[in-house]
């Protein structure tokens, strides 16, 4: 499971 969620 790969989660890419930038905190911008």
Curated annotation (Swiss-Prot):
**Location relative to the cell:** Secreted
GO MF annotation list: hormone activity
What cellular-component terms does GO give this entry?
extracellular region
Native species: Periplaneta americana (American cockroach)
Question: Any idea what job this protein has?
Answer: Hypertrehalosaemic factors are neuropeptides that elevate the level of trehalose in the hemolymph (trehalose is the major carbohydrate in the hemolymph of insects).
Location of Tryptophan amide modifications: 8
Name of the protein in its database record: Hypertrehalosaemic factor 1
Q: What is its main location?
A: secreted
Known InterPro entries for this protein? Adipokinetic_hormone_CS
UniProt keyword terms in alphabetical order: Amidation, Hormone, Neuropeptide, Pyrrolidone carboxylic acid, Secreted
């Amino acid at each position: 499971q790969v989660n890419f969620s930038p905190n911008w």
